[in-house]
Regions:
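Central regulatory/effector-binding core of bacterial HTH transcription factors
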Residues: 1-55
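Short, well-ordered beta-strand segments
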Residues: 1-3, 46, 70, 93, ...
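Acidic, Gly/Pro-rich loop/turn segments at junctions of secondary structure
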Residues: 32-101, 106-117, 121
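A late-sequence structural motif
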Residues: 163-194
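Tryptophan-centric aromatic hotspots in well-structured domains and transmembrane helices
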Residues: 12, 54, 102-108, 124, ...
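Hydrophobic hinge/microswitch elements
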Residues: 115-160, 164-166
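Alpha-helix/helix-capping structural signal
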Residues: 6-7, 73-74, 128, 146-147
Length: 194
């Protein structure tokens, strides 16, 4: 059993499980999907965003992303976004869930040496809803390129500007003590799969 947030499960983990089953069809993988901290406590494996700080706990780094500004081509055309200065004035979608510790627009612009954005704001506490809102032209959204790659590849969202920042932390897989040999095999595969 593996626990992850809705966004991580939908955008990254579920496609990986499909690939894993092609190699290991006899191993059952169950997901516990929750955006509430602590709801994945009975899992063999859990995925976390941040730097692990617990001593004696086994973790594997999955990846560390770059954070990019995303929107639709219609949104980019309507707000004439080709440079950061235009993005500062455009409507922005903010992920307001404190549990994630994700980078905010204010953090993103500051890391690039720009002031806080001045455009209209839309706040949401679920990253999947934030991504859907961006696809519906509500505003621009920050994207972790390892998570949102499929949305960009399918043309549902595009990079609005060339600038990006490295994510301050990565995504890690926690291997709980109760993890079975099959769960560990899955963990090893996840940590090394492309």
């Amino acid at each position: 059993t593996i626990g992850a947030t809705t966004a991580f499960s939908s955008l990254w983990l579920t496609p990986k499980i499909s690939a894993f089953w092609k190699i290991h069809p006899s191993i059952t993988v169950s997901q516990v999907v929750s955006d509430v901290p602590g709801m994945t406590g009975r899992c063999d494996l859990t995925i976390h965003y941040g730097n692990p700080q617990e001593n004696g706990v086994e973790y594997r780094k999955l990846f560390q992303d770059h954070i990019i500004a995303l929107g639709t081509t219609r949104f980019a055309a309507e707000y004439r976004i080709s440079r950061l200065e235009a993005l500062l004035k455009a409507p922005l979608i903010h992920s307001s869930s404190k549990e994630t510790g994700w980078t905010s627009w204010h953090d993103w612009f500051a890391a690039l040496g720009f002031p806080a954005p001045k455009g209209r704001s839309f706040y949401v506490n679920n990253y999947m809803i934030a991504l859907q809102a961006a696809q519906d032209d509500v505003g621009a959204v920050l994207g972790w390129d390892g998570l949102v790659g499929s949305l960009v590849n399918e043309g549902r969202l595009v990079k609005l500007v060339q600038e990006s920042i490295p994510s301050p932390v990565g995504f890690h897989l926690r291997i709980h003590r109760r993890a079975t040999a099959k769960a560990r095999l899955f963990a090893d595969w996840l940590a090394t799969s492309p």
